[in-house]
Regions:
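Class I S-adenosyl-L-methionine
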Residues: 141-148, 152-188
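SAM-dependent nucleic-acid methyltransferase catalytic core
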Residues: 1-77, 85-103
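Conserved Class I SAM-dependent methyltransferase catalytic core
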Residues: 106-152, 161-162
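Short, glycine/charged-enriched secondary-structure capping and boundary segments
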Residues: 76-79, 144-146
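Structural motif
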Residues: 63-65, 130, 184
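A generic structural signal for alpha->beta connector loops
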Residues: 43, 126, 154-156
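Accessory, usually C-terminal, subdomains that scaffold auxiliary metal cofactors
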Residues: 72, 79-87, 105-108, 150-162
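Feature marks short, surface-exposed loop/turn motifs that line or immediately flank catalytic pockets
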Residues: 70, 137, 166
Length: 188
């Protein structure tokens, strides 16, 4: 269901604003496809919890893709959140928004983003960490790099950068310099 909804949603990219007129794709029949599961012979787990609640679980690799700006994920993707949680929240507003008070991410505020990354790197019980971020995030590349180096085994921290096209309603954007960043380290 999570994979099918975006192909029929009457939106431009986020669920907090719907199109005024019905887009052609919203008339498509929603196809539910069984996801292909490839066994690697290991005991894998996928968790749907706040990151702070799972830092004490052992794992080989922790992959984190936290918000990198002040726009909260929950209001922009509230339909997908409701599907993932399979709950029945009280809805409000024209777009049927769920109440997300008390769930705002510390990664979405410049004053708390450093303090959100610190426990992620310090307290997790994994061998490797891979963080997806971008060079225009609320925490600077230098700050996040120094924090990663603080918790990395010597000479294991790497920062990879890739050019990234800014999404602006299918209109090419002339502003250059947006980079997708992957921070990789082996934990001490």
């Amino acid at each position: 269901l999570l994979q099918a909804v975006p192909y029929v949603a009457n939106i431009t990219g986020v669920y907090s604003a719907y199109l005024k007129f019905w887009d052609a794709r919203s008339y498509h029949i929603m196809e539910l496809k069984k996801p292909e599961i490839i066994s690697n012979g290991k005991k894998n787990q996928c968790l749907n919890e706040d990151y702070v609640q799972v830092l004490d679980k052992r794992c080989d690799l922790l992959y984190a893709d936290p918000p990198y700006n002040s726009r909260e994920y929950l209001p922009n993707y509230h339909i997908l959140e409701t599907i993932a949680r399979y709950d029945y929240p009280q809805l409000s507003g024209v777009t049927g928004m769920r109440n997300y008070q008390g769930q705002k991410s510390a990664f979405c505020r410049k004053s708390t983003v450093y303090d959100a990354f610190e426990p992620l790197l310090r307290d997790c019980r994994c061998r490797y960490i891979l963080i997806s971020y971008n060079n225009e995030g609320l925490i600077s590349t230098d700050q996040l790099s120094r924090l990663c180096e603080k918790y990395a085994c010597e000479h294991t921290f790497c920062l990879f950068e890739y050019d990234y096209r800014r999404y602006k309603n299918k209109i090419p954007n002339s502003k250059e310099g947006l980079k997708e960043q992957l921070y990789f380290l082996k934990r001490r």
